């Protein structure tokens, strides 16, 4: 077949005229200089092709073979003519990756299939048997590779990519018109390559050559990108099946297909066929970015499905008690007094103050301690007053440090009662008060400040109070927290008696006293309520 009319092509944005017939004639003459190639089986098995003519580095001529399905081209043109598109055409695009230029040939008419004389007589170029369009599954796409003996023209082949296997895609491939080799056409030696290519390129449909003047009907024939992603997810076991998608989701996932987007996916499919050793850094970054965007889209899709299909769970809400003091204080006079004391407090905090105060009463303690063997109401209580008090300043500071270590051990140990914890904090604050009495101060110095400084340096030697960034150190904050807690428990013991530290049941956590009764006013109100109800 010959084309007599010249066609236009562009190089670097400039339109030039080219006699396509002369160009194809030159290809025929060029192809005639090549000896018949060996069979596919011999080339893949490596039994032939060892001569000088098959050496890719030799000075012999190189042949560019364009493999395409003529039936697919004719079927595409016939479908376009039936749709009323009388100007259906076929485009051939030659791209030079080295010079970063491309030549596009727009062929007005394609009358009948034709082959060159040399390619028709070559057994290696015999067409493969292809299944019908209805016989394949969209998720089982296989991309075949050319033989290792075939090579590209010198002027379009990069030096670093001589041994790269390039994919061959059928032109005008659509979801209803893809062509792949049958099982009997696949040689055993290349079966692993086809399986690897099938897994790597399942997301990229075979787009082939698309005319720059593609119509909207051509765009509608292209597969949906997100539908292809769902197929890959199902095959990898990481997503839902395509049947699980509702029609509304499929319509929502559709996007306007353009020529530029199809060409971009075609280039990505060709780059994905390259081996990691010969792939350029730019191509690797493109593939990584594409995979990251696909993973992000799939994760968002899975999150949306999980939110929509998540079963309803019962949320456990905290128990809210009614802050009614009448249920706790039956005596009217006591109730009026408690109302006056807690008028400025939160009602829920006032209710808990009264509830914990009633829990300390002797009858409540006797009932609560009946099941506890380690808390004896009438037993002796080891307190600082029963021990020999230190006299010197060094002894006091040493006792203070030992008490802090003891508190840390009690907090980490699995003890059954909080009695020892409370007693240790009272002893800690007693050491602190005794050191304030005997410390020697200079003019303008405060006993409280000097006592804290000496205790801190003894407890944490070499650790400054302020960090290099101007903030207080963790050790200084922990030291002040110990002093503050010791003051709270010492105040309770001094107002209500030392026995209160043992009579407090386990239902009253030490964290409630230390965290809820933060201010001095709140602590004294609770102490007065305990004294009133006792």
Curated annotation (Swiss-Prot):
Signal peptide: none annotated. Residues 112-127, 258-275 have a biased composition (Low complexity). Residues 34-61, 110-130, 236-287 are annotated as: Disordered. Hypothemycin is an antifungal agent that exhibits excellent activity against Peronophythora litchii, which could be helpful for the storage of harvest litchi fruit. Hypothemycin is a strong inhibitor of a subset of MAP kinases such as human ERK2. It can therefore be used as an anti-cancer drug thanks to its inhibitory activity of Ras-mediated cellular signals. It can also inhibit Trypanosoma brucei kinase TbCLK1 which is a good candidate as a therapeutic target for African trypanosomiasis. Finally, hypothemycin also has inhibitor activity of T cell activation. Pathway: Secondary metabolite biosynthesis. Coiled coil: none annotated. Part of the gene cluster that mediates the biosynthesis of hypothemycin, a resorcylic acid lactone (RAL) that irreversibly inhibits a subset of protein kinases with a conserved cysteine in the ATP binding site such as human ERK2. The first step is performed by both PKSs hmp3 and hmp8 and leads to the production of 7',8'-dehydrozearalenol (DHZ). The highly reducing PKS hpm8 synthesizes the reduced hexaketide (7S,11S,2E,8E)-7,11-dihydroxy-dodeca-2,8-dienoate, which is transferred downstream to the non-reducing PKS hpm3. This is Hypothemycin biosynthesis cluster protein hpm4. It comes from Hypomyces subiculosus.
